[in-house]
Amino acid sequence: MFTGSIVALVTPMDENGNVCRTSLKKLIDYHVANGTSAIVSVGTTGESATLSHEEHGDVVMMTLELADGRIPVIAGTGANATAEAISLTKRFNDSGVVGCLTVTPYYNRPTQEGLFQHFKAIAEHTDLPQILYNVPSRTGCDMLPETVGRLAEIKNIVGIKEATGNLSRVHQIKELVSDDFILLSGDDATGMDFMQLGGVGVISVTANVAAREMADMCRLALAGQFAEARAINQRLMPLHTKLFVEPNPIPVKWGCKALGLVATDTLRLPMTPITDHGREAVTAALKHAGLL
């Protein structure tokens, strides 16, 4: 369940900014039908930063309900206060989620020892598998391989979503962890190469609009069929980059709307609607991928 194409799912909203259950079901059905391995609910792409604590939990529970056992659900449970991350994680202890994805604390920029103590404390309050999430471009905090190696010794810390885009991290981390520690790319543009170097999948933004293509690319890469996987990846490369032409999830939410997967591309402030330039860039990338 922690391999292949795992979608970092958008959180669809209606025109008033409320979570849209109808569109959420449509998205989940789309991923079930197109081979996505698992769903991450309420991660960065799911707008965790602009959902209240209560809404955050409610969206994960709604996702579980609508998935109805058809696809594994991973809960995003990150926060920059350790107590809040623990509280979020504990809410899902007996919920049915298969694990938690927990981002490094953002803005307050802890030391490496602070990161170790943060994730250790969370793991001590749950039996759920914990996937670390390192994305310094969003958090201002880079969890170094040595810290990952220390955390990997904790029983229920089972893997990491590495989103630096720095492929040398694969080798650096692999040298410090056991063979069964899960390495997932969090950067679509380098995900293919990440798997060729020993990663086992991608937690993907692109999969929101190209579920089948990402699932096929990951399946082929993990089977060692890299030429075939790379052919798909080349078709998707403009999407991998243009979905970040404006801050995530602005472009991908608009892409979901353009494909009819959600009713609106509504976001909550301070995220604002996609610009004309962004719309043109995403449209061109969707066409290049054969999706429009």
Curated annotation (Swiss-Prot):
GO MF term (any one): 4-hydroxy-tetrahydrodipicolinate synthase activity
Single GO cellular component term: cytosol
Annotated residues for binding of pyruvate: T45, I203
GO BP field: diaminopimelate biosynthetic process; lysine biosynthetic process via diaminopimelate
Enzyme Commission number: 4.3.3.7
Marked site (Part of a proton relay during catalysis) residue numbers: T44, Y107
Quaternary structure annotation from Swiss-Prot or TrEMBL: Homotetramer; dimer of dimers.
Protein name in UniProt: 4-hydroxy-tetrahydrodipicolinate synthase
Organism, scientific name: Klebsiella pneumoniae subsp. pneumoniae (strain ATCC 700721 / MGH 78578)
Lineage: Bacteria, Pseudomonadati, Pseudomonadota, Gammaproteobacteria, Enterobacterales
Gene: dapA
